Design a protein with these regions (language model features):
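Short Pro-Cys-Gly-centered "Cys-loop" motif that presents a nucleophilic cysteine in a tight turn
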Residues: 1-58, 65-165
Length: 165
């Protein structure tokens, strides 16, 4: 049996989750749309802060701070299960969508926060999917540029105080 993950309240986590066998599930607009809508639904259900995200063809990146007392594992379990359910429904499939575990790393300070923000933003550029971060529509960079609400842009006015580690 796996050891239960322990998380620290009030801290941002850089979360990465891969698709099963790195299948390019989110390669097309429908796949990315399913992921983003499910992420919006998860945000409404669990009330977490989302500083950044990026939906890549074979994986996702999140920079997320669960609300106090919330369990990041439950958030990720729900997010991955709902995405798989919606994907399978729209594709008439029963396949496993996600790989086994997600990776979650606490963000320790403001310089690391800035590094993770940039790392997530640059992911589609490094993969050759976009010339600039804000050109990738399934990303926090695009959402911030266009004032879309999924990303909590108010966090950037008070960035140093949101990181408590």
């Amino acid at each position: 049996m796996r050891k239960k993950r322990e998380f620290i309240d009030g801290v941002f986590y850089h979360v990465t989750s891969r698709t099963n066998d790195r299948i390019r599930v989110f390669e097309n607009n429908l796949g990315r749309k399913i992921m983003i809508i499910t992420l919006q639904d998860a945000k409404e259900k669990y009330h977490f802060k989302l500083a950044n995200f990026c939906v890549m063809p074979t994986h996702i990146h999140l920079l997320i701070k669960p609300s106090f007392g919330a369990d990041l594992s439950k958030i990720m379990q729900w997010l991955k299960a709902q995405t798989a359910k919606r994907w399978n429904f729209t594709h008439g499939s029963t396949d496993h969508l996600w790989g086994h575990r997600y990776f979650a790393r606490p963000v320790k300070n403001s310089s690391e926060f800035e590094y993770v923000m940039k790392y997530i933003d640059e992911n589609p550029v490094k993969a050759g999917l976009a010339a600039a971060p804000s050109e990738w529509k399934a990303s926090g960079a695009f959402y911030r540029l266009h004032g879309l609400e999924l990303v909590d842009s108010d966090l950037f006015d008070r960035q140093p105080e949101v990181i408590l580690l």
